[in-house]
Every structure is written in structure tokens, then in C-alpha cells.
UniProtKB/Swiss-Prot annotation:
It catalyses: agmatine + H2O = N-carbamoylputrescine + NH4(+). The active site is at 357 (amidino-cysteine intermediate). HAMAP family: Agmatine_deimin. This is Putative agmatine deiminase. GO terms for biological process: putrescine biosynthetic process. It comes from Yersinia pestis. The gene is aguA.
Amino acid sequence: MLQQQALPGTPRQDGFFMPAEWAPQDAVWMLWPYRQDNWRGKAIPAQQTFAKVAEAISRATPVFMGVPAEFMAQAKATMPANVTLVEMASDDAWMRDTGPTMVINGAAERRAVDWQFNAWGGLNGGLYADWQQDEKVAVQVSDFLKNAHYSAPLILEGGSIHTDGEGTLLTTAECLLNPNRNPHLNQAQIEQLLCDYLGVTHFIWLQDGVYNDETDGHIDNMCCFVRPGEVALHWTDDQQDPQYARSVAAFEVLSNTVDAKGRKLKIWKLPAPGPLYNTEEETFDVLTSDAVPRTAGERLAGSYVNFLISNQQIIFPLLDSRTDGQANDLLQQMFPGYAIVGVPAREILLGGGNIHCITQQIPAA
């Protein structure tokens, strides 16, 4: 497929902005997991879990999945029949971070933003050494959609930003100001680029994300917008837990800020599962290579905040039988009128993320 050339200018100059996740969606995109140096059991448990996530999303939203050519037969045998499989090379399966960020305008037009990608840190803490295929994913998706794209001069993953669609952007300094992303840019310069490419006007900076999150503290595991003026925050009451100070600091910031419209924020506290750790059984057959090794006893960055909003559905990870029910009940309160669907998601967590990380919504144009 001949790739389109990037558009000149920026989305903001052209009247485009990133809508909130609860805006109507035409589709959700995913990628096929196959790396045996990241996913256990030859990636089969992860593939089965991705299929369950896709099935849940597809009840309300069409699902498309990028699949490398050599795995197409396996994907066809595993994925629900109503999921559209698209031949596409990738280095791993994190569509939130490698896929396009879609922007829209008031005239029912949609375009894509292609960020630069360096596998969560490049040679300074990145999670694998070769990410050339991942760099091409966003434009392949936008070309498939026949949407023009902008090429943003910023290393950024989709999981590191959340917006309310009304001018406010939520993020973490731990990730966006990390020297392994854009060391040549200061905070003001990064904010200007986000204004230009997402159409936002106001920033809420949390210092840190979830403890031991190997993405360097992505916001989508820590805090997200529920609707304008309301956020969900990953929370623990255990003062001995290293997460406690992070959540308290975030709560302080959120309690003492306003959004782009001048609203004080309502804060929902979503309880942390666990703490959760991976086991010898879950790590012994993960191959060693140039990727970050998986070893038993590592604390997993499990979080119920890592859910997807898609067309009046909430797809959230089931992670711990002790807290899954509480998370479900809170999500019912947070999203009245939505279908709340839990999917067992430990296999995704073992690979370093969760449901929001493996999905990327395509807003309706």
C-alpha cells in the first residue's frame, strides 16, 4: 500500500481536535500479540484474552485487528468472526501507543496524528530494541481508513494522554517529561505541541503514574476522565504500599485544579487490585532476547482505570476476585446507562499493560 504524505500544518490550524473517548465511535483497532519474549505460552494465552476483549467491544463497536501476514491463519482461528483482520506488521500489540490519535472537526471530517515512537524509552529504558514496524502502524491505520494524517514532531504514546474533548489534557510528568522521550524539549514546548496537535488549551499534570509501570507512568493506568468535570483515580488506602504516596499526590493536584472550562473536578477513587505479582509459572517460558526480561516475583502495575469507553460500553479488566466486584459497582455508579463488561485480563497485565493499552478508538466523523 502506498502511504499518503503527511499534511502540512497542524490540526489546530485546520480546526481539528481530539474528542473524548465517550464520543461516538466508528471502530476500535487492536494488534495481534505474538512476541514470545513478552507473552508467555507462545503468546497463546494473550491471544485468547485479546479475542475475549475484541468480542466484548464488538457488541457495540466494530473491531479491526492488525495482524502480521505470517500469523493471519492463527488469528482467523482465534478471533471472533465479526472482527475484521487487516494484514499489518508490528513489533508488539499495543495499539494505544503505536496507533494513530484521531482528531475531528465540526464538519464531520476526521484526520489522524502520527506520533513518533521509541518503544517507551528507546535506548534509555525502552522495552525492546527494534521498533521500526511499530513506527509504521499509525499511518497504515490512517491509510486503511482513507484519513489524511499529520506527522507530529514528538515522541508520544497514546496511553500517556487523556482528554475531556473540551480543551483539557490530563498527563503525567513521569512519562512526558522523562529524558528518555523528548530530552530536547521542555515542559512549555511539549505543551505547545500538544495544543497544536490535539487542539487542547489546558493541562493537568500529575507527577507520577502507577508504581512499577514500565511505560514510565502512563496516565491511562492512573487516572482518566469519566465525563467533563469528573475523573477516576487509581487508589489505595494502604499507607505502607508504595502506590499510596503517588495516589495521594495525584488526589491533591486534582482537588486543587480546574479544567479548561473552570470546573472543579469530581474525583472517583477506583480501588487498586492486589498488590499483584507474577509467578514462576507465568514467566518460565517467556523467551529472553532484546526485550525487557520477565522474571517471577515482579510487582504488576494492575489498575481498573485501564478500561475502554466505547459507544455506551465500559470494557474493564478483571484482575483480582477480592476487588473486581467493587470496581464493577463503582463503574456502574460512574457510568449510569452504560453496559459494564468485565473481561479477565491478567494475561494482558503480564505483558505490561491492559485493555485501554491494547485498543485505539476511531471516533465517528
